[in-house]
């Protein structure tokens, strides 16, 4: 059995496998959140990919980082009225969204909807038919994190356990309700604000550190004691 240092070294030295999501027909890819037919890859570096979005309502740019196995982070710069009408269900995936600027409304089946504004955080299960994201001001800047629990490797799970991260508790946030919203909360918000102030030369390492911090904070977070709202679509 590998010790903690060997586990950490394997995870941190491994490079993102950008094709891992394409190895099976039913696998999930974070880019699907935006409607794959509307996406055009415009940049591809060692650690990230940039995509241009466009439909009749406007344009957008997203920057996607494969942070750890099963964990992605996306910077959203959207100037559109809506996107993602083709998202397929993904039973093992949780989507976390932080709104930096603007407003995002998520429309579900049966006309159920929830919204996030600046400073808000949302958790959404993708196990049902995908929702439509609408941007009433045609301007939205924020961060999306996807957790594909089926793709988080055993090595990664052991590292998270050593850091006292409880993945089961985090996944339960979106099991009871399809959409959970936490209104502006300082204990979480500072993590996302710092993700907008990263020196370019340490971007990838810094993102990894902040993702681990977020997972640890969410492990100890009590929704009942905070200003949370729910949509059961």
Indicate residue ranges for each PLM-predicted region.
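N-terminal low-complexity or simple alpha-helical regulatory segments
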Residues: 1-90
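Short hydrophobic/aromatic-rich motifs at helix boundaries and adjacent loops
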Residues: 33-34, 45, 49, 100-104, ...
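Generic structural motif
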Residues: 67, 78-83, 101-103, 148-152
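Short hydrophobic beta-strand segments that form the core of ligand-binding sensory/regulatory domains
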Residues: 75-77, 95-99, 141-148
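Glycine- and acidic-residue-biased ligand/ion/polar-headgroup-sensing regions
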Residues: 90-111, 149
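Alpha-helical bundle regulatory/interaction domains
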Residues: 107-232
């Amino acid at each position: 059995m590998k010790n903690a240092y060997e586990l950490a070294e394997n995870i941190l030295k491994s490079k993102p496998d950008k094709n891992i999501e394409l190895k099976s027909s039913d696998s999930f890819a974070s880019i699907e959140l935006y409607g794959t037919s509307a996406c055009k890859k415009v940049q591809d570096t060692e650690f990230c990919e940039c995509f241009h979005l466009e439909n009749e309502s406007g344009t957008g740019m997203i920057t996607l980082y494969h942070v750890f196995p099963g964990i992605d982070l996306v910077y959203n710069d959207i100037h559109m009225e809506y996107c993602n009408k083709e998202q397929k269900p993904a039973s093992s995936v949780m989507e976390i969204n932080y709104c930096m600027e603007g407003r995002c409304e998520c429309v579900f089946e049966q006309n159920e909807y929830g919204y996030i504004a600046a400073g808000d955080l949302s958790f959404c299960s993708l196990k049902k038919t995908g929702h439509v994201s609408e941007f009433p001001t045609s301007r939205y800047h924020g961060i999306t994190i996807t957790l594909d629990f089926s793709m988080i490797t055993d090595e990664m799970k052991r590292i998270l356990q050593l850091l006292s991260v409880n993945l089961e508790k985090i996944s339960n946030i979106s099991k009871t309700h399809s959409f959970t919203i936490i209104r502006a909360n300082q204990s979480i918000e500072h993590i996302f604000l710092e993700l907008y102030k990263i020196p370019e030369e340490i971007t990838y390492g810094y993102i990894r550190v902040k993702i681990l911090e977020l997972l640890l904070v969410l492990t100890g977070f009590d929704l009942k004691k905070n200003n949370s709202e729910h949509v059961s679509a």
